Amino acid sequence: MYYQKDESETSNIIKSPIFRDKETFLYKNRYAVFIFSSIAALGLFAYSTNYLNETPTMNSELYESYLKIPMKYGELDEYSTIDLFKQYKTNFSRSYETDDEESLRYTNFKNFLTIIDKRNEDEFIYGSGKSLHGITKFADLTEDEFKKGFLGYRPTYDTNAIVKEVDTELVNRTVVNWANIYTTAVKDQGYCGSCWAFSATEQIESDSIRMGLLTVDDALSPEQIVQCDNIDYGCEGGNTDTAFEYVMNAGGIERDSDYPYTSYYDVTGECTSDTTKYMVTVNEYYSLKDEDDMIAYTLSTGPLSVCVAASTWSSYVSGIITSCDTDVDHCVQAVGVNTDEGYWIVRNSWGTDWGLEGYIWLETGVDMCMISYDPKYTITTLV
C-alpha cells in the first residue's frame, strides 16, 4: 500500500536525533579534525590538549586542507599512544586480568589505529571523503575477533522469498526516516554472531508496527530465533531467509520481555519457546530486485532487512560511507533514506554506543556495502 504523507509524522521524522543535516555533520567533522576530539556517543573521546602541542602549527594556507583530512594516529609517538590507550580503557570500561593480556590488547589497539588511518585514506582515495573513522569500543580486538563476534551472515542458496516490484512513480517524497515510528529501540547483539536473527526480528517488528499489530514498545525476541532455529547456527551465524522460515514454521515469535536475550557472550542456550506467548507470525516474506526498488519501497512504505559488507564498520564514527568492502558478512535494517543528500539510514545491532547512536549512513545509488544484495520485508499477522 502506498504511504500517504502526514505532516505531523514528517515533523517527527525531521526531529529524530539521528537525522542530522549535512551542515551539522560537516561541523562535527571540523571539530573532530581540528581539535582532535569528538563525542563519546559517536565513538571518539576527548583527547588531552597536550597532543595538539606535538603536532605542527597549521598556517592559514593549510587550514582548509587540514579540515578535509582526519588527523593521523600514526603520527603519535609511543608515549602519546600509551596515554591514548589508557584513555580508551577508561572511556570504554576496559580492564584486563593479566599483564600479558594487557600487552596483547595494547598491540591490538595500535593495529586498530593503523586501520583507522587506512580507512580514512580510503574514504578520500576511493570514496568522496564524507565519513570519519576513529576509535570505537572495538579498538582492542583483532580483526578476526571482531568478525567472529559482531558479524555473522551465512549465505543461503535456497529461498522462498517472493520477488516484488515497486511502482517508483507513486513515490512523492525524497526523504524519510522510520526510526522510532516503525521501529523499536536499537539493540545490542553482544559478542555473538547473531546479526541475522536481529535483522529478521527487527523486520518482523517493523512490519507488524506498520500494520498496526504491535507498537514501538513491543520488542520481539531475537533470542528465540538464535536458540530455536535449527537450520542456522546461533552465535556462529545464520541467514534472514531461514530465520523468517523458522518463525513461519514455528507459528510465531515471543516478546523480548518473555524470551530475553542471553547470548551476549557467545553462548547459545537451549530452546525454551512457549507457543502460548507468541505475538505475531510471518505469513510471507518478499525480496526486492535492486536499489531503486529499495529506495522506492523505503520512501513509500517502511524499513527493509538488508545484509551488507560491514567488516570496515568497526571504526565508523560519523558521516556517509562512500568506500566499502564487497564481501557480505552482516545483516542490519535500512530504516530511512535521504535521496536529496544521497544516503541510507541503517540501524545496526551493536548498541547505541557505536556509530550515530547505533546507526550508520551509507551512500545511495551505488550499492554501497552491497546494500541491495538481500533486501527483505514480511507480511505478518497476530497469533
Give the positions of each predicted feature.
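Sec-dependent, cleavable N-terminal signal peptides
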Residues: 39-44
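Short, low-complexity, Lys/Arg-enriched N-terminal segments of secretory-pathway carbohydrate enzymes
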Residues: 1-27
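Catalytic-core signature of thiol
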Residues: 29-34, 45-383
